[in-house]
């Protein structure tokens, strides 16, 4: 169940990447494809083909359940408030490692970010909090990127550092006393500091729209990888998206 829900909506987590540079207000539609391998044991690769609908304005951005609003802008800095669902979790049908465990549910996060943009450099610091009291967790993310232009092709490497508190890690990667079995010892999650590096290629030259290919590698710290539910120390996600204006 959790796997199916995530497949339907995971593309919407990227509302700001599929637009032409210089556009200030637009309704978008298009298609996207994503593939990635979860780090949970026995949790298979996800392949997603998904329609995309969204709106990008000077202050308001809406992509399905993902919403951000620019509260203020001073020089090269902007301050945003944002709402986003967190499609993490599992139930016992997603993998044999989860059999006999309680469902870990998706949640909604609310938070804010400070963004700096100058000379094709972008730096953002964001903080998101679980408001449905599923994990009562917090995530802090710092991202640094730079856009290089090669004619109509834009290349953007991106480095991210994220912090997940112990509440978040314990909920999604921990094993409670009443969930212990022969292959699944008790585990209390610890806070985790993860690192990611991604690269995206974007261009407006195809079919009158905007195309983007992005690949990201994420390395997870011991607070997550020490869990008996986890088999990998990192994963790679690849996405291909095409959008155009209504």
Residues covered by each model-derived region:
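Cleavable N-terminal export/targeting peptides
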Residues: 1-26, 42, 227
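Short glycine/proline- and aromatic-enriched beta-strand/turn motifs that initiate or cap beta-hairpins
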Residues: 19-67
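Residues that define the transmembrane beta-barrel architecture of outer-membrane proteins
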Residues: 25, 45-51, 75, 104-110, ...
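Transmembrane beta-strands of outer-membrane beta-barrel pores
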Residues: 33-39, 57-59, 83-89, 118-120, ...
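Surface-exposed strand-loop-strand hairpins of Gram-negative outer-membrane beta-barrel proteins
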Residues: 37-49, 93-106, 190, 223-228
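Outer-membrane beta-barrel "beta-signal"
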Residues: 51-54, 144, 233-246
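Repeated loop/turn-to-beta-strand initiation elements of outer-membrane beta-barrel proteins
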Residues: 59-62, 77, 120-123, 152-155, ...
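Outer-membrane beta-barrel transmembrane domain signature
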Residues: 68-69, 131-224, 229-231, 244-246
